[in-house]
A protein has these predicted regions:
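Short beta-strand/loop segment that forms part of the nucleotide-sugar
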Residues: 43-56, 80-84
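A conserved acidic beta->alpha catalytic loop
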Residues: 49-66, 114
């Protein structure tokens, strides 16, 4: 088997945090403090933020409060301002951040997330030698990697983190089809309003999800065009894995009919039946 070091020592940045944010000055500060205050080595972490250019309060709080905090820690960081794209184009923020990232691994973070694990960055490093989608544990208890952690190589192969708005579902379904999801002992608390009662704000209220209408809206995550595209993207990554000698039997057998249920291993990680409503469409 050919080996490829996905955490090369010559790269001073191991992990790039990709963080789109809107309208949440205090939660933005909190999400970064819980992340970086519990990091073993913040100097090897890069924070990349995406702001809407009309989000003046959020930008001001970042400049006045968060930026000095990052400077004091010695953390690499950068921020990109966008003409507002909106939640339905969330992936475009992330794809642009990923394009400019320095890290060997990418970590999609949220401005309503709270890190609960000390030395979480070392846990990622300890699991970053091979090509996996790393799945942290969350209060969702969901089979998806709600906060995807993936090698930069993924973006090099596919050209993006996700072509669809629902980034966690996209990367998770591709990874489950390849049987390359690896759960790591990192706990993240997602303080989303419908989960915890926190952050009932305009950002949450304007959160439109392109799912649950696959027969009606061609933008829907489970529309046949997107399902076909996920297969195509999975094939690209499978070809890369084949080239380095990784086992892709699970995916290949599913495509030829030898494996009748490509989602069987994902379902085992779904004790609360979170995906039950999409069983016929995933």
């Amino acid at each position: 088997m050919t080996t490829e070091n996905l955490l090369p020592p010559e790269n001073p940045i191991d992990i790039s945090i990709l963080l789109p944010t809107r309208g949440r000055p205090k939660p933005l500060e909190q999400c970064l403090r819980t992340l970086l205050d519990q990091a073993k080595d913040p100097s090897r972490i890069e924070v990349m933020l995406a702001f809407d250019n009309d989000d003046t309060e959020n930008i001001k709080h970042f400049v006045d409060v968060v930026q000095p905090y990052l400077d004091d820690l010695g953390v690499e960081y950068s921020a990109i301002q966008f003409e507002r794209l909106g939640y339905m184009r969330l992936n475009e923020y992330l794809n642009e951040l990923a394009k400019h990232s320095q890290g060997s691994w990418l970590f999609f973070w949220n401005d309503d997330a709270v890190m609960k694990t000390q030395d979480w960055d070392q846990v990622i490093r300890d699991n970053a030698q091979e090509f996996y989608l790393l799945r942290a544990e969350t209060n969702h208890e969901h089979p998806y990697a709600i906060f995807p952690i993936l090698p930069k190589k993924w973006v090099e192969i596919t050209g993006h983190l996700s072509p669809h708005q629902i980034n966690d579902a996209w990367t998770s379904q591709v990874a489950w089809m390849l049987d390359i999801v690896k759960t790591i002992p990192v706990m993240i608390h997602h303080e989303r309003y419908d989960l915890t009662g926190e952050n009932l704000d305009e950002t949450f209220k304007e959160r439109i999800m392109l799912e649950n209408m696959p027969g009606q809206d061609p933008r829907d995550f489970n529309h046949i065009t997107w399902r076909k595209r996920r297969i195509e993207e999975t094939e690209k990554i499978a070809n890369y894995l084949d080239s380095i000698g990784r086992d892709t039997t699970w995916f290949r057998d599913s495509m030829t009919g030898k494996n009748p249920d490509i989602w069987a291993r994902m379902v085992l990680q779904d004790p609360h039946k979170r995906l039950r409503q999409w069983k016929d469409t995933v």
